[in-house]
Amino acid sequence: MDFIWDSITDWLKEVLVSGIVSNLSGMFDSTNEQIGEIAGQVGLTPQAWNSGIFNMIQNLSNNVILPLAGAILAIVMTLELIQLITDRNNLNDVDTWMFFKWVFKSAAAVLIVSNTWTIVMGIFDADQSVVNGAAGVMIGNTSIDISSVVTDLESRLMEMDVGPLLGLWFQSLFVGICTWAITICIFIVIYGRMIEVYLVTSVAPIPMATMANREWGQMGQNYLRTLFALGFQAFLIMVCVAIYSVLVQNISVSGDISNAIWTCMGYTVLLCFCLFKTSSLARSVFNAH
């Protein structure tokens, strides 16, 4: 009777160990691949990320938004002229210099609007140089491999009883499902940021048309702060990945298997949470809203 029970126990242990090893083998593969692509994705300019989308957005901006920005610029500069005149004691103290001032501001505003796309892309080019410079300094190995974290995985599993093995099998199954969800979240952050970049740049001429006006100029200034925030969000993402790479390389190999699994899982969840926070942090740094 004991022989039969031992045979059943050994068979059940082999099944559970095989299932656990299978679950753990490719558990973090998709997450590792997604994290490994972060540095390459955030280091690209809008034109390099997807030239098709870039050309479409540029055509929309130049052919649809730019004429509207020209009309807004005419209204804004007319209001600016009225304000310049009325500020001088209701026309009782009018100097010719104010008209030269208005002509200069109008010319500067036209120059800004006509070169909006160059200005916007220049901001992202500057951000790209910062991100690429940081990538060479910060990014290390970000891959997680449970088999390398826990040495002699299969032999250590065979030494465990059926009860702990069953619990570990359920843990590995649950963590495997969670890693897919985390992979989707990382995808949303990285691609969502680029979509936001294209949306913001598509309407660039409108806020840039208000730069020369004292009252409306806040719109243009906040728009520029938003562009810088979007650009430097990529730098913050790189910092998050760099911190993550240090953490995963320092996972203790002396702990038990369950602890190693949940430590890897915890670090990946932490990375996902920090990636979501980079947008609000970048906007708060540049006071963009």
Regions found by a protein language model. Name each.
Residues 81-94, 183-187, 215-216:
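Membrane-water interface regions at transmembrane-helix termini and the short interhelical loops
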Residues 175, 179-211, 225-247:
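Alpha-helical transmembrane segments of helical membrane proteins, especially in multi-pass transport
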